[in-house]
Amino acid sequence: MTTFYTVVNWLVILGYWLLIAGVTLRILMKRRAVPSAMAWLLIIYILPLVGIIAYLSFGELHLGKRRAERARAMWPSTAKWLNDLKACKHIFAEDNSPVAESLFKLCERRQGIGGVKGNQLQLLTESDDVMQALIRDIQLARHNIEMVFYIWQPGGMADSVAESLMAAARRGVHCRLMLDSAGSVAFFRSPWAAMMRNAGIEVVEALKVNLMRVFLRRMDLRQHRKMVMIDNYIAYTGSMNMVDPRYFKQDSGVGQWIDLMARMEGPVATSMGIVYSCDWEIETGKRILPPPPDVNIMPFEEASGHTIHTIASGPGFPEDLIHQALLTAAYAAKEHLIMTTPYFVPSDDLLHAICTAAQRGVDVSIILPRKNDSLLVGWASRAFFTELLAAGVKIYQFEGGLLHTKSVLVDGELSLVGTVNLDMRSLWLNFEITLVIDDAGFGSDLAAVQDDYISRSRLLDARLWLKRPLWQRIAERLFYFFSPLL
């Protein structure tokens, strides 16, 4: 009996070390950033079982077998659709401003489609204005409405949007709604999901959370896009979820969420529509490719419209493109670079690009919320401040609530707005959407919004920052080490 237990004991020990060795080898064989690999190895060696389970659950990008097969299957038809769209030559921009030229070329070559011109844009900075405009557009919709949000939180004006959407479905408008399972858990637990389906709306719970499949698909991979398309020529996107800030996370202690949305009319709605159709097919297996822009029903203002490129990121989309786009934008800056983000945990490359811009004389500003709803990200962000301040970057801490806007403005002319945070999750993992706008007029509008944020912010004093307590420095470095995993 003793011999039996001895053998079992040795087999358990051998299996334990083989498991650690196997996961270690898997980490080393994967093409990943060195800081990320080192952080995972540290966790596995300090807390082996916890680390191994965490790595198998969250360490690799698993879309899931069924979704991965759908993603592969959809590309031939999507590529054909993109090729056919190129016949609509009147919608594509041929020239860009010097500051935007490199970025637009990058996006065109990586995505197979160029930027589109003749779009009308309106920046909306108040949640009431966003929802009122959206309700008006829904009420006027004639053919189809597609929506995707990370969070839909019942309450306040979000319920008014839901009522208008159900009314549209009842009068014959084809309505589709895709919501992230984790972000919109309150919605799916409420009566609204059943009410919408009964009204004729196709409601899809994207990336459904299922603990039974935790090792088959990465659970923290989320559908983070916020998009609305109406009749294939009106579109919305930006940082705002379908929530009324007066009813959302009131007990978090960070104040109301401050967001930015863009309302657009023009060919960009078609570019966003193909992104939505890909998401819909990956999630449901149903193909819903949008029609090409119809010049007979779409007002086209070539002379006065804005030029926009749409960048989609996430599994199944061009890898690393949004990260490349941010690097290209930072290196293109010659005079001004202003970045707004709620979560700042950049890659080493992006941090280097930002610091280099400041060191070569560019006026670089980063606007962050002073209070953050994520304790981990808040402390990890602070770990980058010393290097940024030393390079000459201005750091503004917004004090008027949780600044949730995601925007970049380069030299007052090249703008990036959308759903992408400057953190690892947005850059490498989630389904995201970003608009790249080449227009000085829009840049002026965005600059006015950013100036308003700065007026409600406190400029971080480099001298006072260096005098912060030792315990804060230790906490910052600890969270910094694990920043590749956040």
Swiss-Prot record:
InterPro entries, per the entry: Cardiolipin_synthase (IPR022924), CL_synthase_A (IPR030840), CLS_N (IPR027379), PLD-like_dom (IPR025202), PLipase_D/transphosphatidylase (IPR001736)
Reaction equation(s) it catalyzes: 2 a 1,2-diacyl-sn-glycero-3-phospho-(1'-sn-glycerol) = a cardiolipin + glycerol
CC terms in the record's Gene Ontology section: plasma membrane
GO MF: cardiolipin synthase activity
Keyword annotations: Cell inner membrane, Cell membrane, Lipid biosynthesis, Lipid metabolism, Membrane, Phospholipid biosynthesis, Phospholipid metabolism, Repeat, Transferase, Transmembrane, Transmembrane helix
Cell location: Cell inner membrane
The keyword Cell inner membrane belongs to this UniProt entry's keyword annotation: yes
The keyword Repeat appears for this protein: yes
Superkingdom: Bacteria
Disulphide-bridged cysteine pairs: none
Record-annotated PLD phosphodiesterase domain positions: 219-246, 399-426
Similarity field: Belongs to the phospholipase D family. Cardiolipin synthase subfamily. ClsA sub-subfamily.
Record-linked PANTHER family: CARDIOLIPIN SYNTHASE, PHOSPHOLIPASE D
Protein name: Cardiolipin synthase A
Native source organism of the sequence: Klebsiella pneumoniae subsp. pneumoniae (strain ATCC 700721 / MGH 78578)
Gene name linked to the record: clsA
